[in-house]
Amino acid sequence: MDTLSNIPVFADAQWCAIATDIAFKVLCSLGAIMLVMCFAGLSVVAERKVCAYIQGRFGPNRTAIPIVAAVPLVGNFLKKNGLMQLVADGLKFLLKEDPLPKHVNKFWYMAAPVIALSPVLIAACVVPFGAYWSDGQLCPLSAADIDVSLVFALAIGSLGVYGALMAGWSSNSKFPYMGAMRASAQVVSYELAMGLSVLPVVMWVARNSDSPLCLFEIARAQQNVWFCLLQPVSAFLFLVALFAETNRLPFDMAESETDLVSGYHTEYGSFKFGLFFVGEYGHMVLGSSLFIVLFLGGWNPLPGVVWPESWGWVGAVMSLLTFIVKIAAMLFFFIWVRWTLPRFRYDQVMRLGWKALVPLALANFVAYLLIMSF
């Protein structure tokens, strides 16, 4: 400390506070990215285990790393629950041959997987994964607390479709191109319904807050009653649109195996295909986080129950754990729906978006507008 105090920059208390704040934000950014990446990886194992349970199978329970498997109790637990399968999948993607077809547009072909994954990691930095008390004020456990974080997360998160679009176009093949067109049309169709579904939430928060578009303010407004109870129609619309935005069954038109082989990533393999895979599950984690903040009370464990200020950093850790449990529950719901419902036809997906969800979202918005006017 004496050495740092001799440096003019750190001798000033103001600069020390700025440096501390920057370091905290960097750590929060890395934490948000690591949280998304870890959940994206674990979702692959969860997908296999839940699928196996639904189909009456055991799922992955044989893969073992020799050194880790030899550890008493821990090794057997990791093996039986298929957690070592995640390492095997990662090594497979890294060590497989990485072909580069001659007929592709090389630059955009290689950039597409990065474009598909990057928006998720950027948008995750504005999500409040918890809260902590500082100088008597409740502060968000996020990398960036901006007044328009809701708009930022929705806008940046939707840019992931450009990765699919670039992959389909640069592959110079009919099936990837058709998958890319489906992905872009689907995002445009359901982004409108998703945006309309959050407007009643914003209007409700605007009554008592100057920053109704801030995710932290939206979550804090649900300390007494969660918005899924106050606005169930909005929650339902957002959830259905979320399935379409993340290309999950029954809305996986962009990579429908029965129609398009593998869709926009048909020409991909090895690590680049793995990035698309992680990007899809990363979008699931981001979408689940937004749904939790908007309708499931954020870091609050139950309606009317909050973590007290006297708990200090213990309360902050508990709020983060609460959020993580809710994300896990949402991911289980995603997987459960995938292995329960059949895939829709493409015309049914478009008809549902434009002829059902958008009119219902408009009617829901007008209804809440009239209710709040009186």
Region spans (language model):
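Selective transmembrane helix interface/packing segments
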Residues: D2-F374
